[in-house]
Design a protein with these regions (language model features):
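Short Ser/Thr-interspersed hydrophobic loop/turn segments at strand-loop and sheet-helix junctions
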Residues: 53, 76-81, 171-172, 191-196, ...
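Alpha-helical interface subdomain recognition
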Residues: 1-89, 101-106, 113-118, 131-134, ...
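Flexible, small-/acidic-enriched active-site or ligand-binding loops
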Residues: 136, 194-223
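A structural signal for short hydrophobic beta-strand segments in well-ordered beta-sheet cores
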Residues: 139-142
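A short, Trp-centered hydrophobic/proline-enriched beta-strand micro-motif
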Residues: 117-125, 170
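Short Gly/Pro-enriched turn/cap motifs at secondary-structure boundaries
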Residues: 89, 114, 129-132, 157-160, ...
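A short core secondary-structure module
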Residues: 148-200
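Flexible, glycine-rich active-site loops centered on histidine and acidic residues
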Residues: 96-101, 123-124, 135, 176
Length: 388
């Protein structure tokens, strides 16, 4: 495996790092205190990201993006991940599901405007009674005699649906009989904002990712044409799986960035904070914490980089993605907690980013596949060779 970077790759990472420090960090206090990211600020940051060349850097060049390889993309995401997530999100186009399964017309209608910063997308899978269990969803799609589809049901926890121009909604579309019993079939649909019967309601307040909104989506006899299907009929589960692995790596890379920021604060504080006549970094209780934090950070980074390298080689597996996401998200929880402990009471003050990183860390072990789901994937992969 080769993790060394070319001068061009280093320039991309350095440009992203400087952009985060100059354009994102200054707005963190506003977003954290108000829980709101104003639309004019979103557009301002997005325009600067496009001008700088970092917006849509993860999208292939043939579609107008930057064409980053996976390894560089993850390091780019790591730098963006150091900022408040709502601000981070304004800098990246993420319609990878359309890349994976969209038709030429769908890419022209939906993908291209997203890459150009003219449209926003959102993804609707989670339901009040269907989180990790995608096949447990009850929101439904029914085909009519004319070939159109009618959608009904509710989705929730849908990120930035309040400003999205269209939604990719995953719906239960049929039942297949298998040796293990009935299996629910899923189909993905494009649903444009303003479609009759499609309603977006305000979601929930939460402790993580302030400013990064979530919404409740209601579908009441929403009629969409067959051309709105993303991928194939009843193949929505496959559509989701095509991009979910890369998304988990992105989450892991974001965790690396946050952990690195918290760790750097902890090192500086330990080296300069004086107690009992010496810096607290000289006390074994503090120095051992720093040692453990450094080791966990390095281990998570190596798993992320290895998975990214293998992804570019076409050899990455579900096991690689699960281990990387699990390790990085749990490492962030540990590092952010210990960084606060090293700072003492000051670590809980909003003048520092530590309490925000600590709050945000809690979400990373839940979304894009809980830690329990990742462990299930890992153990299943290990035991599969011994199954009859």
């Amino acid at each position: 495996m080769e993790f060394s970077l070319s001068e061009e790759q280093k320039l991309i990472i350095d440009t992203t790092k400087k952009f985060v420090e100059s354009e994102l960090f200054p707005h963190e206090e506003l977003v954290e205190k108000t829980g709101n990211l104003p639309m004019d600020l979103i557009k301002e940051i997005q325009a600067k990201a496009i001008k700088t060349g970092i917006y849509a850097a993860n999208i292939p060049q043939e579609f107008g993006g930057g064409g980053l390889d996976t390894l560089t993309w993850l390091l780019y995401e790591k730098e963006l991940g150091k900022a408040n997530y709502a601000l981070h999100w304004t800098c990246v186009a993420r319609p990878s599901n359309i890349l994976c399964a969209g038709t030429k017309d769908q890419k022209e209608k939906y993908l291209k405007p997203c890459i150009e910063g003219k449209k926003w997308d959102c993804l609707a899978m989670t339901e009040p009674n269907a989180g990790s269990d995608l096949r447990g969803m009850t929101a439904s799609a029914r085909e009519t005699t004319s070939g159109d589809w009618v959608l009904n049901g509710t989705k929730h926890f849908i990120s930035h649906a309040d400003i999205a121009d269209f939604t990719i909604a995953f719906m239960a579309s049929g039942i297949e009989e298998t040796n293990k019993g009935p299996k629910k079939l899923i189909t993905a649909f494009f649903v444009d904002k303003g479609t009759p019967g499609f309603n977006v309601r305000e979601g929930y307040d939460n402790v993580s990712h302030r400013g990064y909104t979530n919404s409740i989506l209601e579908f009441s006899d929403v009629k969409v044409p067959k051309e709105s299907i993303l991928g194939e009929v009843h193949k929505g589960f496959e559509v989701a799986n095509k991009w979910l692995g890369a998304t988990r790596l992105q989450v892991g890379a974001t965790c690396l960035g946050r952990a690195e920021r918290a760790f750097n604060h902890a090192i500086e504080w330990a080296a300069t904070r004086q107690q009992f006549g010496q810096s607290i970094g000289k006390f074994q209780g503090t120095s051992f914490k720093l040692s453990d934090m450094a080791m966990e950070l390095k281990a998570a980074q190596l798993l992320i980089l290895e998975a990214g390298w293998k992804y570019d080689q076409g050899t990455a597996t579900d096991l690689d993605m699960a281990m990387a996401k699990l390790k990085a998200s749990e490492m962030l929880a540990m590092v952010s907690d210990e960084a606060i402990q090293i700072h003492g009471g000051m670590g809980l003050m909003t003048e520092l980013p530590l309490e925000r990183i600590w709050r945000d860390a809690r979400l990373e072990r839940i979304w894009e596949g809980t830690s329990e789901i990742q462990r299930h994937i890992i153990s299943r992969s290990l035991l599969r060779p011994y199954e009859n």
